[in-house]
Amino acid sequence: MKENIHPTTFKAKMTCACGYEAEALSTKGEVVNVEICSQCHPFYTGKQRFVDTAGRIDRFRKKYAKFGEGK
């Protein structure tokens, strides 16, 4: 077996943008900043955000309606 082929692991302090902090093993370093975690992700919190897709579709059709008229 080869020696010294595994990356160095650190006891990392992970900090989320929402302020949640946790400790885990990581090869990235001792401090890891993340944008989203299980405390603030909509899937885990149940706070879903609905996007107004109808308005976006109407804008798309209005914008590209002139290209369909040339036929």
Swiss-Prot record:
Q: Which residues bind Zn(2+)?
A: C16, C18, C37, C40
Q: For this protein, what is any one GO molecular function term?
A: metal ion binding
Which coenzymes or cofactors are required? Zn(2+)
Q: Which Pfam families match?
A: Ribosomal_L31 (PF01197)
Report the cofactor remark. Binds 1 zinc ion per subunit.
Give Gene Ontology CC terms.
ribonucleoprotein complex; ribosome
Q: Which GO terms describe its biological process?
A: translation
Keywords per UniProt? Metal-binding, Ribonucleoprotein, Ribosomal protein, RNA-binding, rRNA-binding, Zinc
Xref: HAMAP family = Ribosomal_bL31_1
Q: What is its biological role? A: Binds the 23S rRNA.
Subunit note: Part of the 50S ribosomal subunit.
The family classification in the record reads: Belongs to the bacterial ribosomal protein bL31 family. Type A subfamily.
The protein's name is Large ribosomal subunit protein bL31
Where does this protein come from, organism-wise?
A: Nitratidesulfovibrio vulgaris (strain DSM 19637 / Miyazaki F) (Desulfovibrio vulgaris)
Taxonomic lineage: Bacteria, Pseudomonadati, Thermodesulfobacteriota, Desulfovibrionia, Desulfovibrionales
